[in-house]
Amino acid sequence: MLLDTLLELAGGINNVTRILAPQGQVVLALKHPPHAPHLPDDVSLQSVLGEWQLSVQRTAEVSDQQLAAIGKAIAERQKRATLPYQTALDCPYRPQWHISPPQGLLNDPNGFIYHQEEYHLFYQWHPFACEHKDKYWVHLKSLDLVHWQWQSVALTPSDWFDSHGVFSGHAVSHQQDLWLFYTGNTRLGTERQRQTMQCAARMNANGEFEKLGPVIRCLPEGVTEHIRDPKVIYTQGKWQMLLGAQTLAHQGRLAVYHSDDLLHWHFDKLYGDELGDYGYMWECPDWFELQGEAFFVFGPQGIASANPHHTIEHQNRIFRATQNAQGEIALLQGWPLDEGFDFYAPQTAQTADGRRVLCGWMGLPDETQHPSCDQGWIHQLTALRELEWREGKIYQHPLRELDTLQSEPHTLLLSDTVTELKTKSFDLQVTLPWGCELRLMQNAQYCVTLTLDAENRLLRLDRSATQIRQGDTIRELKLDSPTVELRILADQSSLEIFINQGEHVMTSRIFTPLDATGISLHGASVDAKLYYMAPASAPFNLEVNV
């Protein structure tokens, strides 16, 4: 059957919400059931989980180009549908200088890269509600890594290979072109069978991204449909694609492919056996070199924590790694990148002057019940961080360009007398003795506490006395330093605590009322340096809707 005939039976392109192509079929998902009183014998109509689907066997007459034309029509309609959701809703929890979505749900940063004298950053977005569903990519640009400008909704879940979500991936700057690699997610049938393909897109002269379709359609042997989040690098004279994967034994591993042209990929092997049973799935891989060492970053899921306060299965890790002349990868030594409540799916980019800068999602996959949901949005990205490899450790430092947002320094005496900062956007730098407790974002009822437990040499972050609705409330970090040096970046509803010059970091969403701007220190009296942080440019398409 011709595709035009099927579209006519479907009631026209405007009645088509998705296109699928499972196992030699063409399936059109419809807003409304077709009006045709009698369908041809080779066309079936069924309701699949409340969605009407019209399907027919795919013949040689139906080309990929024809399917792509339907995908483009759906994409244009999807982009128009996001326009009302590109207006930021006013909210006391909205950050002043972090990236947040105007509405809906933000998750992983994607495609973080320096290309043709500009920084590009994308993020996963579901515009219509605070839920994980049918992911889009938002495109931002910056000249300085501080002030980000909304460019477009770059990718939408419009095609047969990504109909249920444009999942995470990375960008490649090659010659004059900016390429995007991502995982296309589809769900098929009443059992919502997952089907994943690795896909590519390329930016055209108008700054729009044209999908090139799947570049890897089939699963490698021994892997489930949970294989995603491509990271593409150029090494040893060829392109390599790194993917987070799950084996048939439900163990997380790193899947590696190679290519000569970015379009045709060949599977090499799975890596990570030396870690044994290290989670049931690995997500969001990144790979980079720093001071002559190679590093592998990923999100292992299902690792048990030794601390009873840590109940979340979604973890973050960085491993020192090696790659020999044959391309074989070995994972040597690993650590958490962040010890706080809300940090996942980080990506890194190399700046124009050679620094390695990290951006993460300040959230977790299972958290969808924050107070900001009452105002129609959830989650934000972390502050950008510079990475340093020194004395066998990874150190993280706030991006130096953030200093341009700082006020003049103020000396602040921290004591048990509450000082009103009258803001939740600041940079606090202080060295504390063991045996004291710092309270932040404080009023008579709410606060977050940072306790320096002298007996156990534990730094304890406690957000149980906040408005948090979901997630853990205590994090603990073992330290052996004689004092604890802190740099705390605060922004309305978040804290990023850099400990002992960035040897450790604790990143957390902290929700307290608008008037909870007090700070106090109990058990000691110490001078601190305080900078107020000015707002960065809003990363939205339109003005804030008050």
Curated annotation (Swiss-Prot):
EC number, UniProt record: 3.2.1.26
GO cellular component: cytoplasm
GO molecular-function term, one example from the UniProt record: beta-fructofuranosidase activity
Gene3D superfamilies given in the database record: Exo-inulinase, domain 1, Glycosyl hydrolase domain, family 43
Role, per record: Enables the bacterium to metabolize sucrose as a sole carbon source.
Assigned protein family: Belongs to the glycosyl hydrolase 32 family.
Name the record gives this protein: Probable sucrose-6-phosphate hydrolase
Native source organism of the sequence: Vibrio cholerae serotype O1 (strain ATCC 39541 / Classical Ogawa 395 / O395)
Primary gene name: cscA
